[in-house]
């Protein structure tokens, strides 16, 4: 099922109360005046948080979140096991303490807390406050622009004790050019179209001074050339500088879990013709940017190459991947955990174990896709799952079970998107899901209980088929169960232990709400309901969802109707139709 949505808008694309005036000679454009009340800059003062975005603690299943209403921002800590939600701060007390230290006046409703993070112990938080006063010049700061003074704090949640970190300096920022190995000992990066490595010690030196002459760089490759080099990301902005290797970048590689190897895919674009764009963001004037792009019908296509590097001796070799003309190679990666979201310098790790990883190989027309495996020591990748269709084939990320001994594969092979369980040899063990409905994506795999959680739509009768729900099923195909029930669109966050779920849900004509669920869908506690009070006070009314038949008289089309401000149900109105 393709996610196409018909949007019908009658007149102006905002809806509010019947108090709108009718057109008159004295006021020829009342609709525009009324519409201005709902312009983007005005909405930000009437519409606040609409979902809960959890920051899970590094240990356990507690999380914190920030939520804004018409009364300001509040921070909460939730303990799902204890079914409690408590304010993180005594905000009146905190405002007074911050005012005394920073010397800027603060209120409980307006605390400018930045970069709030929790420590490993689950009780200590750190954050910073930017003062209204200019900071003192630092001779080590490369940026000579005037900056505001920043104050750093730690906060002990159980005791509500605030500590001013007077001696703390600005955190050394994580360079975006570094790809750090999982063991943290090696840093690999691309520069001048080739790959280099350095030790963690030298990397730390460069974080403090990027011109430190004592740093030792070891060059791993020498074959990189223009339009066929290592670390050439696709970009529409600053393409001449970025895509031709004049900046350091992380190389877009994936490490083995034991840090002994990494794999990288690069593209040979030398025969592909140039395309040009205007970089309107350049200063002081727009610039002409050039990059490689294959237009429809052109024979010259990018050619993908896959290389494996051995860090024990700094050697590398190309892996044979060839099967389709003008094919594309994509490397499968290990998903990151929710508890890692605020962590810096995270490695990118391949999907698999220390000696094996997975890639997908796609034909140019996307009618043929292979899921392939590669084992270190071999010369070629080996296809284990083949997808063939006469039409465009979509892809979703693989999910690995037990380091890749089993794979959960997403496929539309029977006309509907479903999940299939394979062993690592490519033998189908069983279907996990089936039927006339659409699995959209895997959310979480609980390997211990052999349960997969996934988003799907179109299964519940009488609902808009575009509304996604969270489901769970056993890997053997049994036990299918809807977890997030209700005639809404559901946005979920499943914790790393697959025990609790933050559940945000709404429709176009309802106020968004957020609950905490257990992994079976039972409500543990209510979290939030969005504050629409100021929006309603300004005259806002919800648009109306509707369903009509398509021209074939069979297909249902779902849309949303926004009525004009001075809506007259007896009048014949024109409408705007947007289809994607």
List each model region and its residues:
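Bacterial N-terminal signal peptides
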Residues: 8-15
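Bacterial N-terminal signal peptides that target proteins for export
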Residues: 1-6
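Beta-propeller folds
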Residues: 7, 20-512, 516-517, 533-541, ...
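Structural cue for short, hydrophobic secondary-structure segments
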Residues: 576-579
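N-terminal cap/lid segment of alpha/beta-hydrolase-fold proteins
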Residues: 527-570
């Amino acid at each position: 099922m393709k996610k196409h949505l018909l949007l019908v808008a009658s007149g102006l694309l905002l809806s509010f109360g019947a108090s709108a005036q009718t057109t008159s000679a004295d006021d020829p454009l009342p609709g525009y005046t009324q519409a201005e009340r709902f312009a983007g800059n005005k909405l930000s003062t009437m519409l606040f948080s609409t979902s809960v975005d959890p920051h899970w603690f590094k240990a356990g299943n507690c999380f914190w979140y920030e939520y804004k209403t018409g009364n300001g921002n509040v921070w909460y800590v939730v303990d799902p096991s204890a079914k409690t939600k408590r304010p993180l701060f005594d905000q009146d007390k905190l405002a007074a303490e911050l005012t005394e230290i920073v010397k800027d006046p603060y209120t409980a409703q307006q605390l400018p807390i930045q970069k709030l993070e929790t420590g490993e112990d689950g009780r200590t938080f750190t954050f910073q406050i930017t003062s209204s006063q200019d900071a003192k010049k630092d001779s080590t700061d490369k940026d000579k622009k005037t900056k505001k003074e920043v104050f750093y704090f730690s906060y002990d949640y159980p005791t509500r004790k605030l500590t001013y970190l007077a001696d703390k300096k600005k955190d050394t920022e994580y360079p975006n050019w570094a790809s750090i190995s999982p063991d943290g000992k090696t840093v690999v990066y691309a520069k001048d179209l080739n790959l280099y490595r350095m030790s963690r010690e030298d990397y730390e030196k460069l974080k403090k001074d990027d011109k430190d002459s004592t740093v030792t760089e070891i060059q791993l490759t020498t074959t990189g050339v223009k339009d066929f080099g290592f670390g050439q990301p696709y970009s529409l902005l600053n393409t001449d500088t970025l895509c031709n290797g004049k900046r350091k970048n992380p190389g877009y590689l994936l490490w083995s879990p034991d840090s002994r190897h990494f794999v990288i895919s690069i593209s040979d674009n030398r025969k592909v013709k140039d395309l040009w764009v205007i970089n309107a963001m350049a200063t002081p004037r727009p610039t002409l940017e050039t990059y490689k792009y294959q237009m429809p019908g052109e024979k010259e296509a990018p050619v993908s190459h896959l290389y494996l590097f051995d860090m024990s001796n700094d050697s590398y070799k190309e892996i044979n991947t060839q099967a389709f003309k003008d094919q594309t190679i994509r490397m499968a990666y290990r998903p990151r955990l929710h508890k890692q979201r605020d962590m810096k310098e995270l490695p990118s790790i391949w999907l698999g174990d220390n000696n094996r990883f997975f890639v997908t190989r796609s034909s140019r027309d996307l009618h043929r896709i292979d899921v392939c495996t590669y084992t270190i020591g071999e010369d070629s990748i080996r296809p284990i799952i083949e997808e063939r269709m006469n039409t465009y084939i979509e892809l979703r990320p693989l999910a690995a079970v037990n380091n890749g001994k089993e794979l959960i594969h997403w496929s539309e092979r029977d006309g509907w998107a479903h999940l299939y369980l394979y062993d690592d040899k490519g033998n189908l063990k069983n279907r996990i899901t089936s039927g006339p409905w659409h699995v959209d994506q895997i959310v979480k795999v609980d390997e211990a209980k052999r349960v997969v959680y996934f988003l799907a739509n179109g299964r519940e009768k009488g609902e808009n088929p575009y509304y996604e729900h969270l489901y769970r099923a056993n890997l053997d195909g049994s036990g299918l169960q809807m977890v997030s029930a209700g005639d809404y669109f559901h946005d979920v966050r499943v914790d790393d232990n697959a025990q609790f779920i933050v559940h945000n849900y709404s429709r176009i004509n309802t106020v968004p709400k957020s609950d905490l669920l257990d992994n079976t869908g039972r409500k543990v506690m209510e979290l939030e309901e969005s504050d629409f009070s100021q929006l309603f006070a300004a005259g806002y009314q919800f648009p109306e969802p509707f369903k009509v038949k398509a021209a074939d008289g069979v297909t249902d089309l779902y849309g949303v109707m926004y009525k004009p401000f001075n809506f007259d149900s007896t009048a014949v109105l024109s409408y705007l139709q947007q289809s994607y």
